[in-house]
């Protein structure tokens, strides 16, 4: 690990307590029903290119509707709640319902890389960032969620590549994994500390 890298909040007991409570919350979600897991997947679909706070607001408003609303009704609900990508994301969510029954096995599988690849290949609107986000939110902390906040932070210390391909994402992720190994923290947990440093909050 580069000795110049500093994450002050790693030693802040209040922040550590907040983050590790969130970690336990994620682990609990991972043991939930397939319906709860799907709604968590929807959260990650909706957060892409918007924000976690916007996606959380959609979850609170629409709730179980993500499981059963028709495409048109879901589109209307997203639009009424001022979600920007209501057309394409409603389509993604409805088309992705066929994976609901697979989610418990994917989350329980010891092959985390395989689970992530399966999500990327089989869920509409899910790339490596979103799949990593989902797996982190259900208690799998192996992966880096390389959003704009994390990429900005990494770019202070290392030359990073744009996440425009699988190859580039995995290249950047390997850098992040090496950093996390240096701190002795799993990538998906270190991500929370950096996100807190960059934004002053932890949502999910």
UniProtKB/Swiss-Prot annotation:
Pfam family, one: Ogg-HhH
EC number from the UniProt entry: 3.2.2.-, 4.2.99.18
Superkingdom as given in the UniProt entry: Archaea
SUPFAM superfamilies, A to Z: DNA-glycosylase
GO biological process terms, semicolon-separated: base-excision repair
InterPro entries: DNA_glyclase/AP_lyase_Ogg, DNA_glycosylase, HhH-GPD_domain, HhH_base_excis_C
Site (Important for guanine/8-oxoguanine distinction): residue numbering on this chain: 204
Active site, per annotation: 129, 147
Keywords: DNA damage, DNA repair, Glycosidase, Hydrolase, Lyase, Multifunctional enzyme
SMART domains hit by this protein: ENDO3c (SM00478)
The reaction(s) this protein catalyses: 2'-deoxyribonucleotide-(2'-deoxyribose 5'-phosphate)-2'-deoxyribonucleotide-DNA = a 3'-end 2'-deoxyribonucleotide-(2,3-dehydro-2,3-deoxyribose 5'-phosphate)-DNA + a 5'-end 5'-phospho-2'-deoxyribonucleoside-DNA + H(+)
Function description: Catalyzes the excision of an oxidatively damaged form of guanine (7,8-dihydro-8-oxoguanine = 8-oxoG) from DNA. Also cleaves the DNA backbone at apurinic/apyrimidinic sites (AP sites).
HAMAP family: Ogg
Name used for this protein in its record: 8-oxoguanine DNA glycosylase/AP lyase
Organism expressing this protein natively: Thermoplasma acidophilum (strain ATCC 25905 / DSM 1728 / JCM 9062 / NBRC 15155 / AMRC-C165)
Gene name per UniProt: ogg
């Amino acid at each position: 690990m580069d000795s110049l890298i500093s994450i002050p909040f790693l030693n802040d007991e209040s922040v550590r307590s907040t983050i590790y409570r969130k970690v336990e919350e994620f682990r609990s979600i991972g043991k939930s029903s397939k319906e709860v897991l799907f709604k968590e997947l929807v959260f990650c679909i909706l957060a892409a290119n918007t924000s976690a706070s916007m996606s959380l607001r959609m979850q609170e408003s629409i709730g179980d509707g993500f499981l059963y609303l028709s495409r048109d009704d879901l589109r209307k609900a997203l639009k009424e709640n001022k979600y920007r990508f209501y057309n394409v994301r409603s389509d993604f969510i409805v088309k992705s319902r066929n994976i609901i029954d697979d989610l418990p096995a994917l989350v329980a599988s010891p092959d985390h890389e395989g689970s992530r690849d399966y999500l990327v290949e089989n869920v509409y609107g899910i790339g490596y960032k979103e799949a990593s986000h989902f797996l982190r939110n259900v208690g799998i902390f192996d992966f880096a969620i390389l959003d704009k906040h994390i990429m900005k932070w990494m770019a202070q210390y290392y030359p990073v590549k744009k996440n425009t391909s699988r190859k580039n994402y995995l290249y950047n992720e390997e850098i992040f994994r090496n950093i996390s190994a240096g701190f002795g923290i799993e990538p998906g947990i270190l991500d929370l500390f950096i996100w807190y440093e960059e934004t002053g909050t932890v949502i999910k």
